[in-house]
Amino acid sequence: MRKYLNYLVVIFLISSCASESETQTQIIETTSTTASTTSSSTSTTIQDVKEDISYDEFGIELLDVTPEMKEQFDELIEFVEKKTGLSFVEYPKFNLYTLDGYRDYNAASYLDDFDKDYEEGEWERAVLSQNMWGLNNSSPEELKELIVEFQRCASAGSYNLLDQILRVPIKRNQIKLNLWEQSIVVHELVHSLQGQIVDLSDWYTTMKESDDFMDYPGRRSVMEAQADLVQAYWEANLDPYDRQDMSSQRPNFRCSVSLPTYFYIPFDLYYDFGGRLGKQIH
């Protein structure tokens, strides 16, 4: 299962976005009446309304950033820089999805990585070996589907170590980001800043080439500690009403999918010990 864990290390693999245009046909009824009160004529005019929609490399829709959202991003970037004492080298890259789109991206990017990592028959042999050792009784396809479903619901936002893009799900047709979305953006902006200050892409590539990820959990916990701390600072500025409002805006991120116990992912280290360590350092 090392290859699957490696996928979790990088968070998500390389992605890009492309723009396409979709044309919607709109029917407009127009009525014209002649000078005579006894006769009238009705005509139908067909107009083509073009709507530009952006997609990522998996064909998943990307939501547009409104001018108001751009202002919010600018303010959040300034906040992150102030709290960390560091400055962004360049404007951070980000993709905004609907919640379903974000989950579809997580699944699609994992499957894309899966197809690249496993040679024909390799996955089946690995699962058969697990069956023989009594680790699980799932078929290769069943275990693969379980992992895909876990990927779909396992995160509220993400930052990619390789392409340096942060990805956050938001509600469609919003003018501004709500409080919950802003809080997630703050957390991921810290990771984006970390990626600009430290060459995390090279760090990951070196680990993968040497097949040695022993240092990853400790470093990841420190990275999460800093992101959690800055996020907590931002939320501390909210009054009780806003806190309640933010809580109500939180999507249902409950993940009912559980991976087999031998898929050890030290979330307690990342989000518990790391946070306590960060507070002690601070």
Question: Model-flagged regions — what are they?
Answer:
Residues 153, 166-186, 218:
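Short pre-active-site segment immediately N-terminal to the catalytic Zn-binding motif
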Residues 236-282:
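Long, well-structured alpha-helical subdomains associated
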Residues 76, 196-249:
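Post-HExxH zinc-binding segment in Zn-dependent metallohydrolases
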Residues 102-126, 139-166, 175:
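Catalytic zinc-binding patch centered on the HExxH motif and its immediate surroundings
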Residues 13-16:
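C-terminal motif of bacterial Sec signal peptides marking the signal peptidase cleavage site
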Residues 23-47:
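Extracellular mucin-like PTS domains
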Residues 18-20:
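Bacterial signal peptide processing site
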Residues 184, 188-196:
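Catalytic glutamate of the conserved HExxH
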